[in-house]
Amino acid sequence: MMGTSRCVILLFALLLWAANAAPPEIHTTRPNVPEEIKRPNSTEIETPAVKQLETPSIFLLTTLEVAEADVDSTLETMKDRNKKNSAKLSKIGNNMKSLLSVFSVFGGFLSLLSVVTTTSDLQVISDMFTGVNRKLDQINDKLDKLDNSVELQGLLTNYIPWQYSVKNGIEKLIETYKKMVEETDMNKRRLMAENFILFFENNQIESNINNLIKLTTTTDAVHQNMLFNELLDEAGCDIIRLTRIYMHVRRIFYQGTQLVLAYNSFKQMDPPEMKKYLNALIFIRNMYQSRVWHCKETTIAQSKKDIKDIVKTNAKFGITTVLRKINSELSRKYPWYSWSIVTVKKMLANQRNSTLGNQFYEMEAVGPHGSNFVVIWQGFKEHSQCEDIQKANTIAVLTICKSCHQSHVFTPSNMLNKNTCPNNQYPQVKAFIDRREPFRDEIQRKKSDVFWVAAGFKAPGNPCNHGCNGHGECKVVPYTDQFQCFCHGNYEGKMCQKKIQMKRDISKLISDLQTGYKNAFNVPSLTNILIQGENLAKQLKKMIQRIDNQFELTHILVKYISDLQKLDYILKISFNYSKKKITVDAFSRRMKAFLSLNPVDFIFQQLSNAILAEGFTDIQGKDFFNTFKRMIASNRDACTAPYGNEATILLERLSRLDLTAAESILAYYSFESNYLNPANMKRMLENAKQLVRDSKRRMRSYARYWERTSCPPLNVTHLTQTGCGALLSFEGMKVKLSCDGGRAAVPQNIECVNVNGNLQWSATPKCESSWSRWSKWSACASTCGNATQSRRRRCLGQSESEKCIGPSKQVRKCFVEDCCQEKYGKFKCDNNKCISLSRVCDGNDDCRNAEDESKSRCKYLRSGDRIALRNMAYSQEWLSVQYTDAVQADLYYGRAYLNHCIKGDHVTSSEWNSCAGQSLLIYGNYENGKIGKAIRFGDKIAMYYRKTNYHYRWFICYPTYCMTYTCPKKAGSFTFGPNGGCDEYEFYIINYNDKLSRDPVKPGDVITLANNRGSVKGNGYNRNININDCTVKRAQDDRIECNANAWQIFIK
């Protein structure tokens, strides 16, 4: 938009002064010099012509001067355009930033500045804006070409986040300008402004810019150093890198300031305080200047170090290449000097003691070449001719190698030497050398083998005699007649001759007028009203049409109708101009004709009477605004949000009447001031000042009067009547109160009453606390067993429990179902004991009544059970014992072998009887074989066969074979352990698949019977059973080989 664009234009004019040392400007007294001094060819000495590099400082200075000239040219172009059109807003002085940003604050006459700016003006601004930024880009591009080795992005890593934020903002702003140039519709331009405002705020651009300033100019807490200073430290005395860093950071600062100005102008806020941004630019300028000056003062010491480094890193190259690199590096890094580099056998004996040697030094036997270097320097702008040689303050006389080509010379064109001034061509040179003591004789002896270089041709006089006009500090570059001015903060120019100042004319008065309005009505920002850009005259007409049937208001309108019509006329022609319905000439002519017939003082006096009820028959409190508030309250509930909205709109319009009319008249003054002589201009400026003073006084009066004729703002927490803010109530207003959230309003009604001349509410309303309804009961805290459930209620009020009596929570017991159920993993005993379901049938009497281990419930092996054992290797064979009545009674043993009386893979009920020899009774060692007790894997057991009560035998394996034999004398009477005396009859019953198992043995389990000699093994049909170590000593993986030792158990 116009406001922002011109703010940006002025910003160039305000800020480019900071670039007068960016990089520092160097000025010299430069004598006339021939364009080129021809040098004779030499067979003894290589003297390649060294072209003086264009210095970065000179290039950057030139570019910035062009950029500043573009700004001035653009301003002049716009002035010329305005002259052709008679008058235009942009003619008001050079301080367009203050003027336009102020005009943009209020929408009564000027909403967004794009409204009053022609497309052609926007085009000029847009072209200039992008053009100058393009020039700044070209600076960086040029620096890139001068030094491709500088990794700027790596060096400026900490700047990258802020840099991209600013860069994106600038691109958005340029895009906005371009669209505005093409768009003529006022409302669409406003939308573009709003879009930029949202982009600026959402991306926190101003915060990023402030962070950037802080990052650059504030000392780091950890390193105790500022980032910008650290960047300069990284660059050392490399002038190219120093300048690149400075220009890059300066460009980010500059564009960031552009964005802030544009944002404030688009949003119609007061222009930001520029001091912060100017100080930041001054800061980096001064740091940059100081660093460059330090480099100038230490150039000679730095150059010696550079030569050593170059010779060391280029040891593999010839001396010519090394000298070329030295000359190139010194000329690049220290461009304020011209450099001559010479390799010699030696200097003349007394050369070092000569008074003519203050601008050269010798470095002896440097590097692997063992060469002696003589380095001579002088100011790069110093030029002389051979006849001026006696003015030199330095002459280096050197002994060279005549034919060995070991001596080399690199001299710039502005430095005299033997080749450019041979003795036979310039007798003055010979005479000058001959007269110089103490090495005259030595020169005469070695006339043909010496080479000389003369330097230090400074113009007479002090190059700082101008003193930077008293507005800065002047410093002379060592060994030159060049100087550099360090300007004070508010001065600029080559010799600090320009003072930075802003014109304080009508634009300042408009700013004061806006500030007065904001202070009077405590308005922080007018953005919303601005973006609406509403026509105040039309709004007043709508209000009049709505209530013209009301007697009181009609009375006031009739009384002041003519004065309101005059204000309406001013607003009408102002808006017509803003919408380009009339030309600027027509606006000026109509305003001039109107004001010639209607004195300004009288117009505003009548407006004041209407607003303040100060007319002859007016009554305080019965003015236009208070009467209108009564009309609204009669149609709507008093103090409700709709009432407040409508009353606020009227308040805003009335409060801006004075401001809008004054702005319009000041705009007219500013147009006319371009064509007045100094005397009339001074008189008009005084009128403008008086207009502003009177308007500010009246606006303060309006605010005080409306405050006096209104009760204080009705701001009560939770009160639903939110429409009675400051200045929106009136005497006699009655308000029915209510609160939100179920709270009770106390009292229920209040009134705005007069108490001793002051309006106040008849009571102080409040919303008292009360309990809300109880919530529903919560679910039981548990899914089974005894639990609790609760419900709550809230204290509706400001201080919670302090205002409400009684508990906020209730708790009661609840029961869902018994937790001791199988679905919850539990088992309930008959004695009501509850155990885990996993403990049922585990062989332990957990219920203490054997209920959980009953035979009907638990099918596992018990002591006293009859069992049969099927061999796993011979699946049809069963463990069998032999004993019959025919055997002699005194025969105590019987055979143990495999048999297949049982025909299948399990025992049928009849086979338990018919195959009695293949079933054994088993006893466990628990409670010494107590009948009915569970037998677990790992328990000791004993087995016996009983034919009759008198014929029984116990199963035994000894020593390696198994049989039946008598140890105990009767069945069921077996004593385990050492005291029993029948150890060979005891076996461990082991889970064949899990030796560590301690579970009860169940029908169908595969077992191993083992004693201390081994485990029981079947050997095939009708073969005796024996014992071996299989499955006892072997690993688990050997189970397949021990299948004959595995037995499947069956229980009757």
Curated annotation (Swiss-Prot):
CDD domains found in the cross-reference section: LDLa
Segments forming domain TSP type-1: 768-821
Record domain LDL-receptor class A: where: 819-859
Pfam families, per database record: TSP_1
Protein name: SE-cephalotoxin
Span of the signal peptide: 1-21
Localization per Swiss-Prot or TrEMBL: Secreted
Top-level taxon: Eukaryota
EGF-like domain location: 460-497
GO cellular component, one term: extracellular region
Propeptide positions: 22-29
InterPro entries: EGF-like_dom, LDL_receptor-like_sf, LDLR_class-A_CS, LDrepeatLR_classA_rpt, SE-CTX-like, Sushi_SCR_CCP_dom, TSP1_rpt, TSP1_rpt_sf
Keyword set, alphabetical order: Coiled coil, Disulfide bond, EGF-like domain, Glycoprotein, Secreted, Signal, Sushi, Toxin
Coiled-coil spans in chain: 130-194
Domain Sushi: 709-769
Disulfide bonds: C464-C474, C468-C485, C487-C496, C711-C752, C739-C767, C780-C814, C784-C820, C795-C804, C829-C847, C841-C858
Positions of glycan attachment: N41, N353, N576, N715, N786
GO-annotated molecular function: toxin activity
Summary of the tissues where the protein is detected: Expressed by the salivary gland.
Oligomer status and interactors: Monomer.
